[in-house]
């Protein structure tokens, strides 16, 4: 399944979750797009709820179904809770950590920064958004990319960096000190439903 590249706001409204991280998509119209307005939502079946939760998380991180399922299977081989491990692995993606550093206003913009070669890991350029960063590794912006407007604009509005990243705003550099804990990850996601979906 291909990665969704359509209007992010419309998708956010359909899933009932902010994919931009700003929440603006749901402020005026907190219901799915379509001609029937706020009265069109119907009660979902158990399968429908599981599918919706899976789609929420997949689109939140901007992944294809194949990438998403592969990461899910990898999480199942780790000790501990499958669902929590899955979310922890998703959070360690390079494009996500660039977003968490505040270098991009959305994960989609962060993915483009990585794709276009603006990001380095331990001093080496990495252009694979799905690259899994390991604790202790350092993420930075290439010297010639530090004045990009997209980065400057994001830095002006993003001022929260999670505790598992130590960020130097002057150097545009962060160290991934540890994996995230479940309490630091999106509370609006019920990962147990995703485990149930793939366990059918």
From Swiss-Prot:
Protein name, as recorded: Small ribosomal subunit protein uS4
NCBIfam families per the UniProt record, alphabetical: PRK05327.1, rpsD_bact
GO cellular component: small ribosomal subunit
Keywords, sorted A to Z: Ribonucleoprotein, Ribosomal protein, RNA-binding, rRNA-binding
Source taxonomy: Bacteria, Bacillati, Bacillota, Bacilli, Bacillales
A Pfam cross-reference name: Ribosomal_S4
Naturally occurring in which organism (per UniProt): Bacillus cytotoxicus (strain DSM 22905 / CIP 110041 / 391-98 / NVH 391-98)
Binding partners and assembly: Part of the 30S ribosomal subunit. Contacts protein S5. The interaction surface between S4 and S5 is involved in control of translational fidelity.
Function per UniProt: One of the primary rRNA binding proteins, it binds directly to 16S rRNA where it nucleates assembly of the body of the 30S subunit. With S5 and S12 plays an important role in translational accuracy.
Disulfide bond residue pairs: none
A GO term for molecular function: rRNA binding
């Amino acid at each position: 399944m291909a990665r969704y590249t359509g209007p992010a706001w419309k998708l956010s409204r359909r899933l009932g979750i902010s994919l931009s991280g700003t929440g603006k998509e749901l402020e005026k119209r907190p219901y799915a797009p379509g001609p029937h307005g706020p009265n069109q939502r119907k009660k979902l079946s158990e399968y429908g709820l599981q599918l919706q939760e899976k789609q929420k998380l997949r689109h939140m991180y901007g992944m294809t179904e194949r990438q998403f399922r592969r990461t899910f299977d990898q999480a199942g081989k780790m000790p501990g809770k499958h669902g929590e491990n899955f979310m922890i692995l998703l959070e360690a993606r390079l494009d996500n950590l660039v977003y968490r550093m505040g270098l991009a206003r959305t994960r989609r913009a962060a993915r483009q920064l990585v794709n276009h070669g603006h990001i380095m890991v331990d001093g080496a350029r990495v252009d694979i958004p799905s690259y899994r960063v390991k604790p202790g590794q350092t993420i930075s912006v290439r010297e010639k990319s530090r004045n990009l407007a997209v980065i400057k604009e994001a830095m002006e509005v993003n001022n929260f960096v999670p505790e598992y990243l130590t960020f130097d705003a002057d150097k545009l550099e962060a160290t991934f000190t540890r994996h995230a804990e479940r309490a630091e990850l999106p509370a609006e996601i019920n990962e147990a439903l995703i485990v149930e979906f793939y366990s059918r």
